[in-house]
Amino acid sequence: MNLLNLKNTLQTSLVIRLTFLFLLTTIIIWLLSVLTAAYISMVQKRQHIIEDLSVLSEMNIVLSNQRFEEAERDAKNLMYQCSLATEIHHNDIFPEVSRHLSVGPSNCTPTLNGEKHRLFLQSSDIDENSFRRDSFILNHKNEISLLSTDNPSDYSTLQPLTRKSFPLYPTHAGFYWSEPEYINGKGWHASVAVADQQGVFFEVTVKLPDLITKSHLPLDDSIRVWLDQNNHLLPFSYIPQKIRTQLENVTLHDGWQQIPGFLILRTTLHGPGWSLVTLYPYGNLHNRILKIILQQIPFTLTALVLMTSAFCWLLHRSLAKPLWRFVDVINKTATAPLSTRLPAQRLDELDSIAGAFNQLLDTLQVQYDNLENKVAERTQALNEAKKRAERANKRKSIHLTVISHELRTPMNGVLGAIELLQTTPLNIEQQGLADTARNCTLSLLAIINNLLDFSRIESGHFTLHMEETALLPLLDQAMQTIQGPAQSKKLSLRTFVGQHVPLYFHTDSIRLRQILVNLLGNAVKFTETGGIRLTVKRHEEQLIFLVSDSGKGIEIQQQSQIFTAFYQADTNSQGTGIGLTIASSLAKMMGGNLTLKSVPGVGTCVSLVLPLQEYQPPQPIKGTLSAPFCLHRQLACWGIRGEPPHQQNALLNAELLYFSGKLYDLAQQLILCTPNMPVINNLLPPWQLQILLVDDADINRDIIGKMLVSLGQHVTIAASSNEALTLSQQQRFDLVLIDIRMPEIDGIECVRLWHDEPNNLDPDCMFVALSASVATEDIHRCKKNGIHHYITKPVTLATLARYISIAAEYQLLRNIELQEQDPSRCSALLATDDMVINSKIFQSLDLLLADIENAVSAGEKIDQLIHTLKGCLGQIGQTELVCYVIDIENRVKMGKIIALEELTDLRQKIRMIFKNYTIT
């Protein structure tokens, strides 16, 4: 985190970045200088040590050479003086300090020459000094004459003085040097000898301890060793074995050279030809250099700190503070007026920057003032343009609403008149003309709906109305729209609902049906042979609708544009070109998507994918039915096992291949043993309601009024809201159908006044809005203001019958007594005297009640079974029992538990009705 903060700081601050770079550079230079100084010091120190060692070694060599040369000179002088001596008398020497010894054990008496040599040494003037110990004369008979009387007389002691102790040949210039020998109590000695023509050796012994001691005096951390002519260590050279091994493995020469860990100086001495080798350890050299560096570091480090501190202070004072002042002023100008200026009292680059920035601010101030004036002018122009656009958009919305109202009002009259006409006795030709007129009216209505929906989607005023929707009836309604055109083209139709597809789910049923109708309509339009298939399947939490056809297909280059508004792949085809555009937009609004796959000459498949939010999982119907093989797969998805049909039955109807809702209802009736009871008029409700119709359009009042009368209802007409409010004080109504767009007081305001009217006989009755507007905002506004339901014009008999039934259930729930339908109009099945039919009806109802009782005992859901029982009783005209079942159904919906005693009581009432038809 600290490194990240440092990185951010370095990236955002120039001064800190410069300071950091300077410090880093200074430290690097300082380190380089320290390392360079250390290297130079090491080189210089090495050179100084080499020079010191060279000087000291040279002095030691000179001293040693001088001693060895004096010894050689003494030996030579001894020989020379002996050769000049003639006769020496014993009395001439006093006292007697010389001795005669014989190396051989059998020869104890000196010869004449031996005695002569002894007397010569006695009388010679060679004095023993500090570095010469003894003088000897050794003849060819191994007789030794010694100058000192303290020399030992035993042979072992004299052995080093014999000829055998010297090399066969002179070391140099006729001088013979012996190997160094150690004498107890006397230390290390070496002898130098010279031979005359008779082979007599004249020797002088040299003391070595003082030379060895002096060779270690120059530097206390150097090592001095002595080597012979063969580079072998002399016996008095004591060094560690590791260094000894290194020296033995190196070819040494005079001068300086290196071995691992040491500097070496070798110098050859005169006389015996020995070499003095000085070893100086590298570690000592490095320690001396490190000591010097450590002595210098405090000073250099102090100088570094002082220098960097001074530079940082100067940088802060001369650069950082002015820059921060500049940044502060610049930041203030970003949000404050451009009146602030940078200080410009310096004569450097910062002053130039300040001057340029101030000049820029002056220019910006002028441009800003001009821009403000232009912005004010443009803002005013934009506001005026916005207001004009809003007024135009508002006029457009009003115009669309007016167009919708003006188009739907006559369409309502046309469609209502045709439906009323179809309820009258017509011959086959007249019925065909009526069907054609109705289909053309519905096609025209679909075109109007598409155009209005497209306009509302474009303007963003389109919203969805989500509610629980029954899937299978919706599919039947969509397939019903293409049944006629498909049969006229002799196209096969097929619907398949997959396993686990919910029968009830949460969606906008109107818009989903609109999408399917558009897709199916296009499939019929562009398919000449083959068939059309609607498939519904579930994948995880998605519901997938597939509409496939065997038409001519769409070219690949046209598929990407097929959802574009007003685009037509075939310019010769009919249509507005916005059906797929609306379907795609609606799918996206519903949280899904619409995709297309097409192969030219083979066909097209359009898939609609919608999310499953709230739904009821399907409950399988367990049983076995005799049905055509083509229905077995669909029945199996609902839990029904299919068997080949052995006789004529209702499942052989070809329409069941594409009307899956009818197939499901019929299969449920057959499994539950509910006969397919022939009802004379499926639309006729079992109740006669008091209905108030409020509409300012004469044609609407006339047509809708007649449609309500044809459904067996009592209708009261009101042409305005004021008239409706007056009637509310005179009569109680079960249902009020009211147009929401009326002059003076509109329908929504009328409902509000209706609820607030103190003299109203039933202020809480059900209101259903009648309107030519399909705008979702109008629907929401109606429900927000106390209107229960909303019907868009044109209305159909089926729609009116459905809302009459809803109003009847609403009133029964409020314990309002209703009038039963006129028995002469109802034509209930129970009116027949057919013993077999009535017996089957009783058996079916009895089995259905048994299923309900078993479900209650097992704690399972009974809402679907109760709904089926209510429909059966309604079809046979048992209004009293329908009321009883509706009460049970309402309590089930509220989550209350139904007691078995209530079902037993219902069974007794049914037995009382069918007591004359019970087969025992």
Swiss-Prot record:
<keyword id="KW-1133">Transmembrane helix</keyword>
<feature type="topological domain" description="Cytoplasmic">
    <location>
        <begin position="1"/>
        <end position="19"/>
    </location>
</feature>
<dbReference type="Pfam" id="PF00072">
    <property type="entry name" value="Response_reg"/>
</dbReference>
<feature type="modified residue" description="Phosphohistidine; by autocatalysis">
    <location>
        <position position="405"/>
    </location>
</feature>
<feature type="topological domain" description="Periplasmic">
    <location>
        <begin position="41"/>
        <end position="291"/>
    </location>
</feature>
<dbReference type="GO" id="GO:0005524">
    <property type="term" value="F:ATP binding"/>
</dbReference>
<keyword id="KW-0067">ATP-binding</keyword>
<dbReference type="InterPro" id="IPR036641">
    <property type="entry name" value="HPT_dom_sf"/>
</dbReference>
<keyword id="KW-0472">Membrane</keyword>
<feature type="domain" description="Response regulatory">
    <location>
        <begin position="690"/>
        <end position="808"/>
    </location>
</feature>
<keyword id="KW-0175">Coiled coil</keyword>
<keyword id="KW-0597">Phosphoprotein</keyword>
<dbReference type="InterPro" id="IPR003661">
    <property type="entry name" value="HisK_dim/P_dom"/>
</dbReference>
<dbReference type="InterPro" id="IPR004358">
    <property type="entry name" value="Sig_transdc_His_kin-like_C"/>
</dbReference>
<feature type="transmembrane region" description="Helical">
    <location>
        <begin position="292"/>
        <end position="312"/>
    </location>
</feature>
<feature type="modified residue" description="4-aspartylphosphate">
    <location>
        <position position="739"/>
    </location>
</feature>
<keyword id="KW-0812">Transmembrane</keyword>
<comment type="function">
    <text>Member of the two-component regulatory system SsrA/SsrB (SpiR/SsrB) that is required for intracellular proliferation and systemic dissemination within the host. When inside acidic Salmonella-containing vesicles (SCV) within host cells the SsrA sensor kinase autophosphorylates and the phosphoryl group is transferred to the response regulator SsrB; phosphorylated SsrB activates the expression of genes encoding virulence proteins, including pathogenicity island 2 (SPI2) and other horizontally acquired genes, and antagonizes the action of transcriptional repressor hns (H-NS).</text>
</comment>
<dbReference type="Pfam" id="PF00672">
    <property type="entry name" value="HAMP"/>
</dbReference>
<dbReference type="GO" id="GO:0005886">
    <property type="term" value="C:plasma membrane"/>
</dbReference>
<protein>
    <recommendedName>
        <fullName>Sensor histidine kinase SsrA</fullName>
        <ecNumber>2.7.13.3</ecNumber>
    </recommendedName>
</protein>
<keyword id="KW-0808">Transferase</keyword>
<feature type="topological domain" description="Cytoplasmic">
    <location>
        <begin position="313"/>
        <end position="920"/>
    </location>
</feature>
<dbReference type="InterPro" id="IPR036097">
    <property type="entry name" value="HisK_dim/P_sf"/>
</dbReference>
<dbReference type="Pfam" id="PF00512">
    <property type="entry name" value="HisKA"/>
</dbReference>
<dbReference type="Pfam" id="PF02518">
    <property type="entry name" value="HATPase_c"/>
</dbReference>
<feature type="binding site">
    <location>
        <position position="549"/>
    </location>
    <ligand>
        <name>ATP</name>
    </ligand>
</feature>
<keyword id="KW-0547">Nucleotide-binding</keyword>
<feature type="coiled-coil region">
    <location>
        <begin position="354"/>
        <end position="395"/>
    </location>
</feature>
<keyword id="KW-1003">Cell membrane</keyword>
<dbReference type="GO" id="GO:0000155">
    <property type="term" value="F:phosphorelay sensor kinase activity"/>
</dbReference>
<feature type="transmembrane region" description="Helical">
    <location>
        <begin position="20"/>
        <end position="40"/>
    </location>
</feature>
<feature type="domain" description="HAMP">
    <location>
        <begin position="317"/>
        <end position="369"/>
    </location>
</feature>
<keyword id="KW-0843">Virulence</keyword>
<dbReference type="InterPro" id="IPR003660">
    <property type="entry name" value="HAMP_dom"/>
</dbReference>
<keyword id="KW-0418">Kinase</keyword>
<dbReference type="InterPro" id="IPR011006">
    <property type="entry name" value="CheY-like_superfamily"/>
</dbReference>
<feature type="domain" description="Histidine kinase">
    <location>
        <begin position="402"/>
        <end position="614"/>
    </location>
</feature>
<dbReference type="InterPro" id="IPR036890">
    <property type="entry name" value="HATPase_C_sf"/>
</dbReference>
<feature type="binding site">
    <location>
        <position position="405"/>
    </location>
    <ligand>
        <name>ATP</name>
    </ligand>
</feature>
<dbReference type="InterPro" id="IPR005467">
    <property type="entry name" value="His_kinase_dom"/>
</dbReference>
<keyword id="KW-0902">Two-component regulatory system</keyword>
